[in-house]
Structures are given as C-alpha cells and as structure tokens.
Amino acid sequence: VSKGFVVLAQNNKTVDYVTQAYALALSIKASQLEYNSISLITNDPVPKKYQKIFDQIIPIPFNDDAGNTEWKVENRWKIFHATPYDETIVLDTDMLMLEDISSWWEYCSNYDIKFCSRIKNYKLDVVEDKVHRKAFIANNLPNVYFALHYFKKSDTAYNFYKVLEFVCNNWEWSYDHFAVKEYQKWLSMDLTAAIVVDMMGLTETALDKNSPLEFIHMKVPLLGWPTGTVNWSSTVPVNLTSNGHLEVANIRQHKLFHYVEKDFITKSILKKLEAAANG
C-alpha cells in the first residue's frame, strides 16, 4: 500500500505557492520517519532544484478551472483523481511539518476519509474559530478543515470528491440551499467540504473530536491579540533551528504548522529547511 502527501499549488500574481510547496516538502523529508513521499499537482514551472524533492510532479487534470481567480481553489476537487497513492494526506501549501506523524497514518488507515476538525494557536491551546466560521455555526455545518485531510482510494472518497466537484462548480446555488445564513460570497473549500460531508451523512465517520489530526493555525484573529495586529511574524520572535524545530515566542511548535502569511518563507528559512532535510 503506497502512502504519501499531496499538495496542489498554483501561483498567482503575488504569491509563489510552488516555493511554499517546496518548503513543505523539505519539512516533510526532515521530520518523517516512515512516510515521507510528497507529490505536487501543478501546471506552473517547477525550478530544477525543487524537482528532486517531490516524488511526482503531476499536471492539473481536466483543464485548469481556476482562470484568473486569486485563491485558485477551483481545482481542489481533482486531488482524488490525481493522487498517485493508495492512501493520501492532503495539505495546504502554506504549512510546515515539524514532527513525525506516523501515528496519524495508523489511525487514518481504519477509515476511508477523515478531516481535521481541531486547531490550536501557537501557545498550543485548542481554539474555536468564531470569526471566520460564522456560516458553519449559523447553518449547523461540521467544522471541516480541508487544509488537512486523509483519504484512501475507496468508493466513499470517490463519491465525496464527485459531490465536491458538483458543489465547487455550482457553489452559489449550493450556498443558497445549504449555507444561506451568514452567506459567504466566495468559494471556500472548508465550507464546500462541510456542505458535502453534511449532505452525504459523513459527519459521524469523517470527523472525530478524538482524532489526532490537528494543526497550529496562525490566522491573527485566532491568536487572542488586540485587534489591528496585522502580521504575527513581526509581532513575536520566530526561530527555526538547524534541525527543523520551530519556536514562536519561545514555544516549540508541534506537528503541523499553518503559517498563513504569504511572505513567511524567506531565503534564510528555506536554507535552514534544506539543511534539515539533507541532515
């Protein structure tokens, strides 16, 4: 049985998501003891230096549906069809893997599809997002985080992604029918996936409060700081050690770190990640 991580990256005018994916791949190579394969789905050019870190570089299947949109999420439903693995963990590009998560694979292999539904702040406290998740709360939808989920090649996962394709391609109609309160005027994978989980009756099986799946979420409104703070990385000290440990405000960060800020991956951080991956 093949197991691996998959990330979909499409650069826009301001953000180099391919470099973020490279940084994530380096962190996976540095931290994972058992499963460290990562494949990149992209139509963007991948620098030669980056290419060797990826198990496979896969073109986006069925044409590019994202066009000129800023967030480039329109192709995410294709991940199921593009993954080269029997079992896949899907990640967002703007993340770093800081510790071995072999136990996650062990846990997830008992299921066809599993979503993260728990996030923490950099102080390692569990947080509930009431700022960005008003539509979830108002419409009683499951607390799905698409940025971290697992699936195995199975009928359940295939059907989930088929319905996801429909909801992505008809998101305004779908939101009108399933998320009409606190109406969201843009396509979001979290809300879309939550609607699909709910429609398919997967809430009990695809989400689990006791699941090990979690990540540290650095969206500023979740950090409990005064409103008006813009950048977390210029507000608290950040230190990435040469062996790939990340400290924020002198607190060592665990497992999976979702840094969110688009300019977080500097040349010096890339160098340290390269050293850790080659170490």
Predicted segment positions?
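A glycosyltransferase accessory/donor-loop signature
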Residues: 1-8, 18, 40, 53-54, ...
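A short, glycine/small-residue-rich beta-strand->loop->alpha-helix junction that serves as a flexible
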Residues: 12-21
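Short, acidic, metal-binding catalytic loop of nucleotide-sugar glycosyltransferases
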Residues: 27-35
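Short, polar loop motifs at secondary-structure junctions
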Residues: 41-48, 99-100, 211
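Active-site regions of enzymes building and remodeling cell-envelope glycoconjugates
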Residues: 51-64
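GT-A fold catalytic core of metal-dependent nucleotide-sugar glycosyltransferases
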Residues: 59, 72-125
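A short, glycine-/small-residue-rich helix N-cap motif at loop->alpha-helix starts
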Residues: 64-74
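Conserved catalytic core of nucleotide-sugar-dependent glycosyltransferases
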Residues: 106-168
